[in-house]
From Swiss-Prot:
Belongs to the glutaminase family. This is Glutaminase. The lineage of its organism: Bacteria, Pseudomonadati, Pseudomonadota, Alphaproteobacteria, Hyphomicrobiales. It holds the Pfam family Glutaminase. Its EC number is 3.5.1.2. SUPFAM superfamilies: beta-lactamase/transpeptidase-like (SSF56601). It comes from the Bacteria. Keywords: Hydrolase. The gene is glsA. Substrate binds at S66, N116, E162, N169, Y193, Y245, V263. GO terms for biological process: glutamate biosynthetic process; glutamine catabolic process. InterPro entries: Beta-lactam/transpept-like (IPR012338), Glutaminase (IPR015868). Homotetramer.
């Protein structure tokens, strides 16, 4: 990739997004997120050679929220392998990310690891055999290792805010517990879940952490394999089909990349073999995904010809 072209494209898109009046609405159901400035926008692209193109608020930390689910799934697969799929499916949900009705209909087995119920089940698997603090420490250290940055932390205020208001997540967890899907005390599993969703990262840190998914499971920064090639491809497949809740089809249609969103306004996207991409714009669309984040990524893939479906 020509680094000058990449720098120019990222700067151009960041400037365009700064001028757009349609910014979506910040997540209001988590009090700590409700006060985030909707004018913020950051974009970072790290290509296969390690060149970093950054625009806007690229180094401002934000709450990654559900983007953490990509990394907890990666950890859980490393710990338990295919046993993960006894607890959670691999199909798009077609429902809201916190739907209770679907969970009831399917006897406590979540559709995929990226909706809330699925991520809670994955968190429970990581927690097994550990104290909550140990499990959470393992998740945080994994994120720091991938990004090569020990300054990444959990925003305790956001975690506390989610714990105070996370009644629907508690309902999901208790429902799964009633079907034997969860092994650990619900309050322990939820505590770890709320805290890993409250990890704060910048676009630069997030793009660094996601590089292994763009390079067949290998972290180019260290040269070490994080996961196998097959596992990286399968995680990317789930990101493409399930990474944006019931907006996943629209994201695939418009952007054409595997991606995972969070209600903090972040999106981690993967251009296989080409780049790891992180974008942040706090305003959300009706499906709970970053409004300008999707528009920016669509512009990026169109201008660079990076859609996995061809130019």
């Amino acid at each position: 990739m020509n680094p000058d072209l990449l720098d120019h494209t990222v700067a151009e898109i960041a400037a365009e997004m700064a001028q757009r009046p349609d910014r979506g609405a910040v997540a209001s159901y988590i009090p700590e997120l409700a006060g985030v400035d909707p004018q913020r926008f950051g974009l970072v692209v790290i290509d296969a050679d390690g060149h970093v193109a950054a625009g806007g608020d690229a180094d401002m930390p934000f709450s990654i929220q559900s983007i953490s689910k990509v990394f907890t799934l990666t950890l859980a697969l490393g710990l338990a392998g295919d046993r993960v799929w006894r607890r959670v499916g691999r199909e798009p949900s077609g429902s809201a990310f916190n739907s209770i009705v679907q969970l009831e209909r399917e006897r406590g087995i979540p559709r995929n690891p990226f909706i809330n119920a699925g991520a809670i089940a994955v968190t429970d698997l990581i927690l097994s055999g550990h104290q909550p603090r140990e499990a959470l420490g393992e998740i945080l250290r994994f994120m720091q290792f991938l990004a090569g940055d020990d300054s990444i932390v959990i925003d305790d205020a956001v975690a506390a805010s989610e714990q105070r208001t996370g009644f629907r997540n508690a309902a999901l967890a208790n429902y799964m517990k009633s079907f034997g899907v969860l092994d650990n005390p619900v309050e322990y599993t939820l505590g770890v879940y709320f805290h890993h969703c409250a990890i704060a990262m910048s676009c630069r840190q997030l793009a660094l952490a996601g590089r292994f998914l763009a390079h067949n499971g290998r972290n180019p920064s260290t040269g070490h394999n994080v996961v196998s090639t097959q596992r990286a491809r399968r995680i990317n497949a789930l990101m493409l089909t399930c990474g944006h809740y019931d907006g996943s089809g629209e994201f695939a249609y418009r952007v054409g990349l595997p991606g995972k969103s969070g209600v903090g306004g972040g999106v981690l996207a993967v251009a296989p073999g080409k780049a790891s991409i992180a974008v942040w714009s706090p305003g959300l669309d009706a499906a709970g995904n970053s409004h300008l984040g999707r528009i920016a990524l669509e512009a990026l893939t169109r201008r660079l010809g990076w859609s996995i479906f061809g130019v």
